[in-house]
C-alpha cells in the first residue's frame, strides 16, 4: 500500500484524447509535497507517513509547528495529512513526492470537503418529489410530509431524511481515472468532477477497488535528489 498525496483543486477544463474526443477533467496541483514525519509500528503501533504541501508564512506558524518542520528540514506547510502505508513503502522524512507518483490510466480515490449549500429543503437535499401543486394542497408543496408513525413507536427514527444543512461534508469519490500528469508543473488531471471548491485541498490515493498498474513507481514518485535516491535504494532492497 503506497502513500497518497495532497493536491489543490484548481478547477475544471477539458482535454482531447487520441480519438479526438473531448474529456472533462479536474486539474489538481501538487506544490512542494514533502514527507514531514513517519509513523512506525515500534513507536506508534502502525505504519504511516505525514505529508505537508504548500507554503505557510513563518509568522503564522506556531512555535511548536516551526520546530516540527525544522526537524524534518522542510519549509512550513499550509496543509498536513497522514496516509497509512505498508512497511516496504515507508518514505524517508524530507523527500518530495511529484505528480509522477500516478500514471495515466490509473484509478484513484479522491477525498475532499463538498461545497456548502446552507440550509436546504428535502427536494434539493434528498431529491424528494414534493406534493401536488393544486387540488386542495395549501402551503405544503415542497414539504417532506409525515415524519413518523403514531404512539407506537412514538418517535422519529434516526436518519430520517429531513431539511437541514446541505454540503460541507467529507466526501470520497472512488475509481476516478487519471488522464495525464505533468511533473514539471505538478499537475494531475483526473476524469470528471472532484468534491470541493476551487482552491480546496484534495487527498488522492490509489484506488482500493482497482489493481495498481505495474508501471506505477514504488515506493513513490520522488523528486531526484540524495534523499530520494536513498529512499529508492531502500525500497528496492
Swiss-Prot record:
Low complexity bias locations: 220-237
PTM-bearing positions, type N5-methylglutamine: 151
Keywords from the UniProt entry: Methylation, Ribonucleoprotein, Ribosomal protein, RNA-binding, rRNA-binding
Keyword 4Fe-4S: no
Molecular function terms, GO-annotated: rRNA binding; structural constituent of ribosome
GO CC terms in record: cytosolic large ribosomal subunit
Keyword Glycoprotein appears in the UniProt entry: no
Biological process terms in GO annotation: translation
Record's compositionally biased regions (Polar residues): 135-150
Domain of life: Bacteria
Gene3D superfamilies to which the protein is assigned, alphabetical: 3.30.160.810, Translation factors (2.40.30.10)
Entry-linked InterPro entries: Ribosomal_uL3, Ribosomal_uL3_bac/org-type, Ribosomal_uL3_CS, Transl_B-barrel_sf
UniProt modification remark: Methylated by PrmB.
Region (Disordered): 133-155, 213-237
Complex and partners: Part of the 50S ribosomal subunit. Forms a cluster with proteins L14 and L19.
Function: One of the primary rRNA binding proteins, it binds directly near the 3'-end of the 23S rRNA, where it nucleates assembly of the 50S subunit.
Family, similarity comment: Belongs to the universal ribosomal protein uL3 family.
Name the UniProt record assigns to this protein: Large ribosomal subunit protein uL3
Source organism phylogeny: Bacteria, Pseudomonadati, Pseudomonadota, Alphaproteobacteria, Hyphomicrobiales
Amino acid at each position: 500500500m503506497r502513500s497518497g498525496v495532497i493536491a489543490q483543486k484548481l478547477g475544471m477544463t477539458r482535454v482531447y484524447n487520441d480519438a479526438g474526443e473531448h474529456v472533462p477533467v479536474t486539474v489538481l496541483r501538487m506544490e512542494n509535497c514533502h514527507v514531514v514525519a513517519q509513523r512506525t509500528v515500534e513507536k506508534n503501533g502502525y505504519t504511516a507517513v505525514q505529508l505537508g504541501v504548500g507554503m505557510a508564512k513563518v509568522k503564522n506558524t506556531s512555535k511548536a509547528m516551526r520546530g516540527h518542520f525544522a526537524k524534518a528540514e522542510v519549509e512550513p506547510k499550509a496543509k498536513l495529512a497522514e496516509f497509512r502505508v505498508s512497511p516496504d513503502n515507508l518514505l524517508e522524512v524530507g523527500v518530495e513526492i511529484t505528480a509522477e507518483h500516478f500514471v495515466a490510466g490509473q484509478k484513484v480515490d479522491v477525498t475532499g470537503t463538498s461545497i456548502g449549500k446552507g440550509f436546504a429543503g428535502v427536494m434539493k437535499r434528498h431529491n424528494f418529489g414534493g406534493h401536488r401543486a393544486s387540488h386542495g394542497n395549501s402551503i405544503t408543496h415542497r414539504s417532506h410530509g409525515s415524519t413518523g408513525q403514531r404512539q407506537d413507536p412514538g418517535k422519529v427514527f434516526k436518519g430520517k431524511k429531513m431539511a437541514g444543512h446541505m454540503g460541507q461534508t467529507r466526501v470520497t469519490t472512488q475509481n476516478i481515472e487519471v488522464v495525464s500528469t505533468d511533473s514539471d508543473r505538478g499537475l494531475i488531471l483526473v476524469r470528471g468532477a472532484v468534491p470541493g471548491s476551487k482552491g480546496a485541498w484534495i487527498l488522492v490515493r490509489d484506488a482500493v477497488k482497482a489493481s495498481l498498474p505495474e508501471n506505477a513507481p514504488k515506493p513513490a514518485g520522488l523528486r531526484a535528489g540524495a534523499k530520494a535516491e536513498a529512499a529508492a535504494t531502500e525500497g528496492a532492497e
